[in-house]
Amino acid sequence: MNDQLTAIYTELLLMKEELQSRLFEYSCFQVSTSPQAAINQKQKATLIYHIKEELQDVLLALSKIENGTFGYCEETGAPIPLAKLAVLPTARTANDFLYSVQFEKKTLPIWKSTDIEYGQALYE
């Protein structure tokens, strides 16, 4: 394993540890019957879902490194440059990097403090 791949592997191990910690933290919430608690539980359930998805991606990347198939596009079989994988180590296809370009072009709405929906937008 070369230095760049070792660095990616180490980063994935750290990601795994952090995601498992977050999953445990969000899984240990108290059950309450208040309406606000119900909203919080839905938000936590959504967070847990996304954390589990990311954790699965990390575990898959780690297993690919261990069995020697890391760095190859799942669609075409073409190698993916390690420089790109260092940025997005859970990428499974070469097309995964195209999405980051699309996300960078998007902007968030600019809210003025005088907008009526400003406060609501911050908490939705």
Swiss-Prot record:
Annotated source species: Bacillus subtilis (strain 168)
Pfam families: zf-dskA_traR
Zn finger region (dksA C4-type): 73-94
Protein name: Uncharacterized protein YlyA
Keyword Zinc-finger part of the UniProt annotation: yes
Signal peptide: none
InterPro entries linked: Tscrpt_reg_DksA-rel_prd, Znf_DskA_TraR, Znf_DskA_TraR_CS
A Gene Ontology molecular function term of the record: zinc ion binding
Keyword annotations of the record: Metal-binding, Zinc, Zinc-finger
